[in-house]
């Protein structure tokens, strides 16, 4: 746990916001088991905070990246497309795609990304839109992850968004955010970033999340949640030179 200083709001550009965050990382494991462990931990954290009505929305950036690669879109156009899809700006996406000389079949799939969110049915729909192997592999991983979450009874907390992207270009696989009512921003964000550590040395498969404690507490307050705290225990007070006896 620690304080972070970052500007994540489009309404306060140029101003840093201090917030308290807590999170976890799993490094050195690129398996779907690691994805499951981190997503389950996110759900456990939200449940332990007393939240009952919340959703963890999961996407996979490899679906989008597969389409970009096939269409040959990169540079400024790719960055603009990320922003527009992330904002669910359907008409902005349409205008940009119309200005590019790309295969209409790929363009049609990209145009649907702002609307490809919801239940597990979204994944089945997306799988029928393309034959791109990278895209289908991304869908397959999400389907398998959902099957595992269903086994442990956590599927009721899960929804999907294939338009879930990030201006942080380091995400390499699944990406997720946790939402609950009472606050207008995610309580938790995270995803897989297998190439990030490599910028500081050697590549290590990594997945993790960060939970905004301030946003979580605001949600708990507005939902009038009162989480019992165990205050039982013994307070041991001792002088500096009496540590051995205190132990």
Predicted regions and their residues:
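Positively charged, Gly/Ser-enriched RNA/tRNA-binding surfaces
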Residues: 1-51, 97-247
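Short, conserved phosphate-binding/catalytic loop or strand-edge motifs used
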Residues: 17-22, 58-66
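Hydrophobic mid-domain F-helix/FG-region of cytochrome P450s
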Residues: 41-47, 63-70
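Short, surface-exposed recognition loops or helix-turn segments adjacent to catalytic cores
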Residues: 53-63, 81, 159-163
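Short, solvent-exposed helix-helix connector turns and helix-capping sites enriched
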Residues: 60, 88-89, 119
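Short low-complexity, flexible loop/linker segments enriched in glycine and/or proline
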Residues: 70-72, 174
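Acidic, His- and aromatic-enriched active-site or binding-groove loops in soluble protein domains
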Residues: 73-95, 102, 154, 180
